[in-house]
């Protein structure tokens, strides 16, 4: 289960018509910091600072912050140290992001302001998404009604299918070893997939290993807490209690554990070198070939609402026969 997040009312209204949504904007994230033996809010809240054993040192570091230094930061480490100081950075950001992105230094992450949480040190409401629309489908089947729409249009859907590019110039592809010709192709997979020799090098992704744990209790997490993050040396990044989203009634509860790995292509790396590499691949696609979605756009920050926006824009382009290229929205160029 995944909640729907957006700052755009039109995208919310569009999905809400198809899948009635229940608001859950009050939910909070907590991060466990082992050195303090304490849970703090994520993003960090100003009230958390009072609980910290080294709060005096942190206060001095915060007083030395410079807006100019923050603005001119070149990588994730610089950005966060300039924003909250070295002590808070080491408590909550450094180890967490190194294990999340499987890197030995956050200096390697040079697009560093992509966090949807939108704050380095929060004040006001403790809910992580108080300035955005956060919601989840009311029905027990989640988003299924949205994904069932193609059935109503009598579209042909093929599962477990091998899809291979034969010739972009001649619009020829191979499906299960049978050659086919298409007028328009919409791809949501990594753009380097279509190039045999990976001419610019393979695009890097981070995957996830998921472990499910059932507990003999109706709920485990505190009220309004759906996610627990772990900013220490444990292998996993976070735990999720799915019942908080679904409102499922049961005597037991299911917790999901997420461990970063190289299994699967879930998260494009927020690294300029990789993003520029993806643009080179996408520039090879003709105007009738669309590369969209998180993997197709090769942007970690592309969320569900962005995918909907891309799809609706693409629909308009196709209906108006006004193909503009692989990205149907200029901001992702």
Predicted regions and their residues:
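Conserved flavin/dinucleotide-binding core of flavoenzymes
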Residues: 44, 238-333
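Mid-domain catalytic core of redox enzymes
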Residues: 164-281
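Short catalytic/ligand-binding loop motif for oxyanion handling, primarily in non-cytosolic enzymes
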Residues: 31-33, 40-42, 89, 99-106, ...
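A short acidic, glycine-rich active-site loop
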Residues: 1-3, 133-137, 212
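Short loop/edge segments at beta-strand edges and connector loops
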Residues: 25-26, 157-162, 167, 207, ...
């Amino acid at each position: 289960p995944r909640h729907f997040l957006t700052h755009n009312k039109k995208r919310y209204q569009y999905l809400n018509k198809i899948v009635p949504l229940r608001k859950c904007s009050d939910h909070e994230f907590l991060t466990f910091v082992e050195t303090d033996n304490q849970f703090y809010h994520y993003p960090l809240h100003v009230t958390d600072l009072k609980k910290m054993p080294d709060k005096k040192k942190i206060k001095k570091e915060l007083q030395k912050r410079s807006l100019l230094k923050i603005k001119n930061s070149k990588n994730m480490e610089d950005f966060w140290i300039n924003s909250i100081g070295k002590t808070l950075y080491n408590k909550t950001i450094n180890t967490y992001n190194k294990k999340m992105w499987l890197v030995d230094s956050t200096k390697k992450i040079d697009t560093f302001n992509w966090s949807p949480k939108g704050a380095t040190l929060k004040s006001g409401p403790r809910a992580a998404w108080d300035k955005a629309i956060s919601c989840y489908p009311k029905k027990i089947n989640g988003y299924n009604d949205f994904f069932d729409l193609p059935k109503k249009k009598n579209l042909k859907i093929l599962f477990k299918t091998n899809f291979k590019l034969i010739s972009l110039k001649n619009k020829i592809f191979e499906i299960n070893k049978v050659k086919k010709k298409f007028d328009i192709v919409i791809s949501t997979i990594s753009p380097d997939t279509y190039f045999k020799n990976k001419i610019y090098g393979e695009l890097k992704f981070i995957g996830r290993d998921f472990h499910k744990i059932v507990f003999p209790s109706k709920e485990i997490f505190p009220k309004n807490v759906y996610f627990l993050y772990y900013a220490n040396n444990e292998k996993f990044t976070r735990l999720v209690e799915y019942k908080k989203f679904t409102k499922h009634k049961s005597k037991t509860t299911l917790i999901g554990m997420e461990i970063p790995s190289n299994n699967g292509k879930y998260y494009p790396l927020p690294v300029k070198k990789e993003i520029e590499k993806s643009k080179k691949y996408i520039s090879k696609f003709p105007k009738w070939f669309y590369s969209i979605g998180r993997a197709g756009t090769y942007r970690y920050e592309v969320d569900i609402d962005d995918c909907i926006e891309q799809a609706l824009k693409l629909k308009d382009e196709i209906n108006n026969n006004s193909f503009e290229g692989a990205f149907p929205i200029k901001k992702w160029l």
